């Protein structure tokens, strides 16, 4: 089926400054309050609310382009459509190919023809990308402000598309450019690294949760506004799927496990290692919890992508995000727009988004999570929330919890018992379909029997998930056993010792609850 692609853009934005010559970042938008509007649920047959004259003129022109005449058609006589709204995370920033006129100099929405909305497997005649790099919720909500002179407020664009097509899915990715200021924070972190000014975690960590708490109501109101737009266009809430998609982490600390790691300068991983740990383990998870809360309170379908790029971060073997990138083709002197593509999903990242969205749409789920399990390069949708899936495992004999030593997820890290706490390095998820045990630190590290040594005394470690025999385990009561050697059990011989294989004997030291 041929799709007509219309584009726009999005924000989370530009990150990394260029060596010393920056200090700027992605940019975009301005705040704005949200108008609280509630519309009664309409049937699909209900007449739409008339648009303001200026928007109606645009709608009529677009209808003529699509159908050959300007009138608004009944839903069942329209072409089907998908639409994405939001910021740079979904506009296509970072892909490298952009639709005119969104590649400057007066419009930097950076909408890509390879953005996720254009690449799903969801059957649709038309796809629309009205997101814009740098957008915050004030550029999306009802009564908001356009980012550029040739742009509409994104909710107005939705109102037009909803009257000219039968919209099947509305995708929203927003919030990073509100209180969080993700782009400026990333820019500052990179600048501090390039200028040897010290890690940025101490600067931002104390107020990070407050930033998340501040953006949640704005995202919630934006979702409600989009519902209102659709109701005013004659849709019942059940006529389409409204998806709020969470953000993945573009960075992580395990890039040195890449056997072909070329160095940070080459792959663009400009940042302190400690900041990559904080970003993956704390900053992005806190943001994810806020987005999940916004979806739950508004009834939107939620797609948790917080672990989607695990194993595919900047500088890994198969990165789904772009590292620090300076666009030397941009006319004029280097500025924030020269680096705005940095630390955004690349074409493979958008392909991953598209796959997750396709699976989500087909599933009918109201909440789901997506990740690449076992390094296949193919995202898999799970009918669960990652926050609910990962749990501690406590040893019955010692009272210790199964722990990743020093909260380090590098290949070869020991797995041991330790005093229980709330850290992610003590949470685990057992994938019953694949029999793998994943650490809460990253979806890309699994419990591993090194070198397939299924003998007594072998110590368990973390390793890049691959789904091989030495990473498959069975649950038998409260015991965990290698699937290839079910007569041996994971055992903690004493407090704070490494977990080792021993012949199963039914003792408390082999039971984890």
Regions found by a protein language model. Name each.
Residues 149-211, 249-254:
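Oxyanion-hole/transition-state-stabilizing segment in secreted/luminal serine hydrolases
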Residues 60-133, 190-191:
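Serine-esterase "nucleophile elbow" of acetyl-processing enzymes
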Residues 1-41:
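Secretory targeting and sorting signals
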């Amino acid at each position: 089926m041929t799709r007509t692609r219309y584009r726009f853009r999005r924000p989370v934005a530009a990150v990394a400054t260029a060596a010393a010559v920056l200090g700027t970042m992605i940019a975009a938008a301005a705040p704005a309050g949200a108008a609280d509007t509630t519309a009664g649920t309409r049937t699909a047959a209900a007449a739409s609310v008339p648009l303001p004259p200026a928007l109606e003129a645009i709608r009529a022109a677009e209808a003529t382009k699509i159908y050959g005449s300007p009138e608004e058609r009944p839903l069942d006589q329209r072409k089907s459509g998908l639409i994405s709204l939001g910021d740079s995370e979904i506009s296509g920033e970072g892909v490298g190919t952009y639709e005119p006129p969104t590649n400057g100099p007066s419009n930097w929405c950076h909408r890509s023809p390879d953005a996720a909305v254009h690449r799903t497997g969801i059957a649709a005649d038309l796809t629309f990308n009205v997101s814009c790099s740098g957008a915050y919720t004030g550029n999306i909500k009802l009564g908001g402000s356009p980012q550029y002179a040739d742009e509409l407020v994104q909710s107005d664009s939705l109102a037009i598309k909803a009257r000219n097509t039968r919209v099947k899915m509305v995708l929203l990715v927003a919030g990073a450019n509100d209180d969080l200021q993700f782009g400026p924070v990333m820019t500052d972190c990179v600048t501090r690294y390039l200028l040897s000014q010290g890690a940025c975690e101490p600067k931002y960590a104390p107020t990070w949760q407050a930033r998340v708490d501040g953006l949640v109501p704005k995202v919630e109101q934006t979702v409600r506004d989009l519902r209102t737009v659709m109701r005013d266009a004659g849709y019942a809430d059940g006529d389409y799927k409204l998806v709020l998609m969470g953000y993945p982490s573009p960075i992580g600390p395990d890039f040195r496990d890449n056997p072909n790691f070329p160095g940070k300068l080459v792959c663009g991983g400009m940042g302190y290692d400690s900041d990559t740990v904080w970003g993956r383990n704390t900053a992005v998870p806190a943001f994810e919890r806020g987005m999940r809360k916004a979806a739950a309170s508004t009834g939107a379908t939620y797609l948790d992508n917080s672990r989607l790029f695990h194993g595919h971060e900047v500088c890994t073997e198969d990165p789904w995000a772009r590292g620090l990138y300076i666009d030397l083709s941009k006319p004029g002197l280097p500025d924030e727009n020269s680096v705005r593509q940095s630390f955004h999903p690349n074409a493979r990242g958008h392909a991953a988004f598209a796959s997750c969205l396709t699976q989500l749409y087909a599933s009918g789920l109201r909440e789901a999570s997506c990740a690449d399990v076992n390094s296949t390069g193919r995202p898999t949708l799970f009918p669960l929330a990652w926050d609910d899936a990962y749990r501690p495992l406590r040893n019955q004999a010692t009272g210790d919890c199964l722990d990743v030593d020093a909260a380090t997820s590098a290949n070869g890290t020991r797995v041991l018992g330790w005093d229980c706490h709330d850290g992610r390095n003590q949470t685990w998820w057992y994938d019953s379909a694949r029999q793998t045990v994943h650490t809460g630190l990253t979806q890309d590290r699994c419990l591993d029997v090194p070198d397939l040594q299924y003998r007594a005394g072998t110590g368990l470690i973390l390793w890049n998930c691959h789904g091989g025999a030495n990473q498959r385990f069975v649950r038998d009561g409260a015991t965990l056993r290698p699937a290839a050697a079910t007569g041996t059990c994971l055992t903690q011989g004493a407090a704070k010792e490494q977990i080792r294989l021993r012949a199963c004997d039914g003792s408390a030291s082999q039971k984890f609850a």
